[in-house]
């Protein structure tokens, strides 16, 4: 992806990243490759971990699809969801002129999503 993608964080994600940073302090990446600490994890790492914990039918992409579906069902704006998923605008004219990020709305949306995921733990 050659364009900037800003990802608003939930409180839960912020805490996870803070904890991970404390573990990897001094390393170039928060989620570094276990083999090469100066490189990021590979595209297949999450899927391999899902298989390792016994979720052979689940892929990392399934989490994106689940989030998208539930956020649409909760009534969030299509533009916010698509922007959060880093989907490119198919309308070339709109893509040329509309550079909105909807950061405040997406921050609330991602907090709502994180709260939903947290509720699954209970």
State the predicted function of each range.
Residues 8-57, 88:
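Active-site/catalytic core of tyrosine-dependent DNA strand-transfer enzymes
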Residues 3-7:
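Short beta-strand segments
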């Amino acid at each position: 992806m050659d364009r900037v993608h800003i990802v608003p964080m939930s409180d839960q994600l912020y805490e996870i990243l803070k904890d991970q940073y404390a573990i990897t302090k001094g390393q170039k990446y928060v989620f570094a490759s276990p083999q090469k600490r100066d490189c990021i994890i590979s595209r297949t790492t999450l899927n391999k971990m899902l298989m390792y914990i016994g979720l052979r039918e689940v892929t990392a992409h399934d989490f994106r699809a689940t989030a998208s579906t539930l956020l649409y069902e909760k009534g969030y704006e299509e533009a916010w969801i698509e922007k959060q998923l880093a989907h490119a605008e198919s309308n070339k004219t709109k893509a040329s002129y509309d550079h909105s990020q909807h950061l405040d709305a997406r921050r609330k949306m991602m907090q709502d999503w994180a709260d939903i995921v947290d509720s699954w733990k209970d």
